[in-house]
Amino acid sequence: MPRVSVIIPAYNAAATIAGTVESVIAQTVQDFEIICVDDGSTDATVAIVKKFGDRVRLIEQANSGPAAGRNNGARHSSGEYLAFLDADDVWMPQFLERSVGALDADPALSLAYCNCALADSEGVPIDTSLVGHGFDHAPLLNELLTRLWPIMPSATLVRRTAYDACGGYRDALKGASFRFEDTDFCIKMREQGPFAYIDEPLITWRFAWFPKQLKRLPDYSKALHVFEAYLQERYGVSAAPLVDARMRAPRSILATIGLKALRDGDRPRARAAFARAIKVDPYRLKNYLRWIRTWLPDRLAQSLSGKSSRRARSDRAYQE
């Protein structure tokens, strides 16, 4: 029986799935199984996964979303620890070594997670660290309920007993499509035991924000209200700050992408990112000013930038 089951939910991931699987195969710890759950892909994802032969076990399901895919993979797995790796993210070679070591060192831990490097949907680096000041420690439960903690699914290693006890990922809530399964899962896992934080960027997390997703923002807001009602029912008004932070997250990440592009001199890319951030939150004046800067001559833009460039790291997701 392998110590670790690596579960990769994939939907139309033909462009990235090979690199994701190869990053698992390259781990310094080799006591694992890889399970890829294809979520009804219509591209070449399945064909690419099959090229890995018996290194990857393929499970195919009707399109049901990543939460259902993770749970399905867990049901077919046998490892003591579970790792949920998204099909467009990649691990550094030491990810499993560090994460397994953390859980082995303290049987009370329910989950270990690490810092992340951040890239856009095309793999272009945005930042070397997702976790900023004030978030560089394992959270208490009340911190998870009041702040949007930067814990990416791909950056976690989960103790199976804790996963089973919390019921896994939630893929529906009161009949509504559930959009915040990652946040919900972390809260449920923290109820099972403390976390360990590894202060190294051992994965590259790709933030995929495409123009077509802007059309889904009304659904995002509707789902957020459902999530808010659930949190209030379970935890009371103490979780209200988490809902506010969850709403700000897409805007903050887009602003980070725009600032990085602006520093790199890529004005069209910066302009597009700020424009999307404005659509996400039209009441955020700062992003209008940033968008205007992309049209100005360099010298004038720099004179108007104020502290923006120096605050680029603090503008990343979860902190703006």
Residue ranges: model-predicted function:
Residues M1, P150, R160, F178, ...:
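C-terminal subregions of glycosyltransferases and related glycan-biosynthesis enzymes
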Residues G132-P218:
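Conserved nucleotide-sugar donor-binding catalytic segment
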Residues N12-A26:
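Short, well-formed alpha-helical segments that are part of the catalytic scaffolds
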